[in-house]
Amino acid sequence: MARDYPKEFEPIVAKAKSLGKPMRVAVAAANSENILRGVFAAEDDGFVKPILVGNEDKIRAVVNTIGEGGRELDIHGVFGGDNPVQYAIEMINSGDADTLMRGNCQTRDYLLPVLNKANHLIEDDALVTHVVFLKVPGYEKVLAISDVTLLINPDLAERKQVLLNMVDAMKILDIEHPNIALLTMVEKPCFHMRDTVEAQTLVAKHKKYPIADCNIAGPISYDLIMSKEAARLKEYDCPYCGEFDGIVVPNLMAGNLLVKVLMNNAGAVGFGLLTGAKIPIAISGRSDAPEQTYLSLAACAAKLVK
């Protein structure tokens, strides 16, 4: 696989490669072509040791299909009604793996075992969120967006935790004091739009008692987030317009659609990871390019670097 990704992500890969030893990744339902291409590229670059979990015959068939039949494989066969995601999690809990990667399984089937507190990947009071990092053409900075998979309609407390998780995740890019936007449809509080009122409340709380080491603005619409000129024309007084590092979205539909539109129609390139668990967890779609899997794994490895 060609290492074809924006130069802005190079610090993440460099940090991943500085990990003292390869990160042991349990790939659940590993019979996925593009997932394995990304996993094997990370292995070749020295920061991943893959453990392939699932139906062995299907895994070997995919490995042969992508031209990797000569590669030494560590396969853990799972048969019948056994859940490969659950098996992979048990490997982590037993100390035989460091993190988890989604393979050829539905998002729901991957996330439910991860979120199950009985599986010990999450502290009792923790909230797991999905952060996506994008390089959008025409926008100078890497842009983090969350939450895009887990929280259907987050309340004020949950949006605060989304923000905290995002700020923590941004450290893989050495961003220590990011500018965070609380996305809403309009830039003024409106009683009929709960998210605008909560954004105003969150900003007010942050000004009085800082929530995290970051700057926060909101409520703010997407055009103002991305453009200083739009802010000037609409007389929106915020020094961070056009220079935001992250966007906290109001709900799952807004976040998921925003990411998909930017990636499918605007040429954005990026990756995601799950944050808020005891370990960083990789996640990539089955139709995603191998580079997205590679970068998600690099981000997890970078998080493990002390």
What role is predicted for each listed range?
Residues A2-Y240, F244-P250, A254-K306:
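Anion-binding alpha/beta catalytic cores of soluble intermediary-metabolism enzymes, centered on
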